[in-house]
Swiss-Prot record:
Pathway: Secondary metabolite metabolism; lignin degradation
Keyword Lyase applies: no
Protein source organism: Sphingobium sp. (strain NBRC 103272 / SYK-6)
Catalytic activity reported: syringate + (6S)-5,6,7,8-tetrahydrofolate = 3-O-methylgallate + (6S)-5-methyl-5,6,7,8-tetrahydrofolate
Deletion phenotype: Mutant cannot grow on syringate, but grows on vanillate.
Biological role stated in the UniProt entry: Involved in the catabolism of syringate. Catalyzes the conversion of syringate to 3-O-methylgallate (3MGA) in the presence of tetrahydrofolate. Has weak activity with vanillate and 3-O-methylgallate.
PANTHER family: AMINOMETHYLTRANSFERASE, AMINOMETHYLTRANSFERASE, MITOCHONDRIAL
EC number per UniProt: 2.1.1.-
Protein name as annotated: Syringate O-demethylase
Keyword Methyltransferase: yes
pH dependence: Optimum pH is 8.0 (in the presence of 1 mM tetrahydrofolate).
EC main group: transferase
Gene that encodes the chain: desA
Length: 462
């Protein structure tokens, strides 16, 4: 008899220890090499010239179609759908009945009664569960990420063209001036004789477009973009640099799925299988709460307070209404101290007392990194995504901390490494924990992102 996600958690006994010792590392980025040139130049290209991210392989897609599609997605998301119409997209965020974030994906409003969700699996699975168990007149079609399929063929290709020269490259690829789109608006364009969907979007703290279309057009469109980029310094980005781009733009890629705890998600855990995301995901870092609830994050904690709208009925509305005026963690960037980083790295050349290894450019070693942020030894928040930015010349981390300590310039410390020498994850070697001094900085860290994303959730506060 097939096991459910709840069976897996029950059999594990201590769910925190179970997920912290899962035999899975961080998310992988298949389909592209680790580096096309080297990750330093690839990072610098998105700030200096332009890059082409290939997102065709690592994300899940879920088509949602039918007469109830709009109402269905509206009921599951904290976002307002007021004035939401075909040709627009949004960062779609579902929460549990208790108000904890499950994940986020990009929601494309393609046509009347037709939507596409693109991103990581947790939010996708949540939508599938409610479609399967509710009375919604919707049809869902899942297109699985490459790592979990054998045919290598996707429904759509998906590229991100980003950087100061992105507009010039797109102009050359199209043979005409691209449409002037507002942030998160879409239009159809022509590249190499193919119809291409274009979403005005931004990653890595730089302006640009997300481009997508039928898989059969992959080579023609990709080749045309590469050719157009030759005179504009276009760099292809491999998996190593790709995983670090969020450090400059301020998006938290890995909120712990709130459906893994709480009575309000019990039916989901009984429905989800033993191979579902929640049964396989890993947690890493120095922060070890007593229960999975300790990993839960609210929309405000990760900077999504601005998109919480109570103008519609949705799962978790009552819980969020109660939370709205309560204190929340505040999302910040932590800039790790240069000298302390040199101290940590020098430990790698010692016979004993080695700190947890910092991989470059992304030092994330689990699917859900959670490290403690301390002030005078007191826990004041958690750090998530961590890594090195060649553009900034700093080791950075995205963190959520007590607002009392969130003012830029405040000195804190990051507790780096896991307790008791580390867990059994394959990405963890024996090591000792150490505190690394850090300074609170704005989020996004990139000055371009703070200016260019002025009208988005990345910079606004609720």
């Amino acid at each position: 008899m097939a096991k459910s996600l709840q069976d897996v958690l029950d059999n594990a006994g201590n769910a925190v220890d179970f997920l912290r010792n899962q035999q899975t590392g961080p998310n992988v980025y298949p389909g592209v090499p680790a580096e096309y040139s080297n990750w330093r130049n690839e990072q610098r290209a998105w700030a200096k010239t332009a890059v082409l991210f290939n997102q065709s392989y690592h994300m899940v897609e879920l088509m949602v179609e039918g007469p109830d599609a709009f109402a269905f997605l509206n009921y599951l998301g904290i976002n307002s759908f007021k004035n939401f119409a075909p040709g627009k997209a949004k960062q779609w965020v579902p929460v549990t009945a208790e108000g904890y974030v499950i994940g986020d994906v990009i929601l494309f409003y393609l046509a009347e009664n037709q939507f596409n969700l693109v991103g990581r699996a947790p939010a996708i699975e949540w939508a599938e569960f409610h479609a399967a168990t509710g009375k919604w007149n919707v049809t869902l079609t899942r297109d699985e990420r490459t790592a979990l399929r054998t045919d290598g063929v996707r429904r759509h290709y998906r590229f991100q063209l980003q950087g100061p020269n992105a507009m010039a490259i797109l102009t050359d690829a199209m043979g005409q001036t691209p449409p002037d789109l507002k942030f998160f608006n879409m239009a159809d364009i022509q590249i190499a004789g193919k119809t291409v969907g274009a979403l005005r979007h931004g990653m890595a703290g730089q302006p640009g477009y997300e481009l997508y279309g039928p898989w059969a057009d992959y080579e023609a469109v990709h080749s045309a973009l590469v050719a157009a980029g030759k005179n504009h310094g276009l760099a292809l980005v491999g998996g190593r640099a790709y995983s670090s781009n969020t450090l400059e733009s301020g998006w938290v890629p890995s909120p712990f799925p709130g459906y893994l705890f709480g009575e309000g998600s019990a039916d989901f855990r009984k429905w989800a299988g033993e191979n579902s995301y929640g049964a396989k995901c890993s947690i890493g870092g120095s922060y070890v709460p007593e229960s999975l609830e300790g990993y839960g994050l609210t929309p405000w904690d990760i900077g999504y307070g601005i998109i919480v709208k109570f103008d519609h009925d949705f799962i978790g509305k009552e819980a969020l209404e109660k939370m709205a005026n309560e204190p929340h963690l505040e999302k910040v960037t932590l800039a790790l101290d240069d000298e302390d980083m040199l101290r940590v790295m020098s430990s790698y050349f010692s016979d004993s007392g080695r700190a947890k290894y910092f991989e470059f450019p992304s030092a994330v070693y689990s699917m859900h990194p959670y490290d403690s942020v301390l002030v005078d030894g007191k826990h004041v928040g958690v750090s998530t995504w961590v890594g090195y930015s060649s553009n900034e010349g700093k080791m950075l981390t995205l963190a959520m901390i007590d607002p009392k300590y969130a003012k830029p310039g405040t000195e804190v410390s990051l507790l780096w490494g896991e307790p008791n020498g580390g867990t059994s994850k394959p990405t963890v070697e024996p090591h000792e924990q150490t505190e690394i001094k850090a300074v609170v900085a704005p989020v996004p860290y990139s000055a371009v992102a703070r200016t260019g994303y002025a009208d988005s959730w990345r910079t606004k506060k609720a």
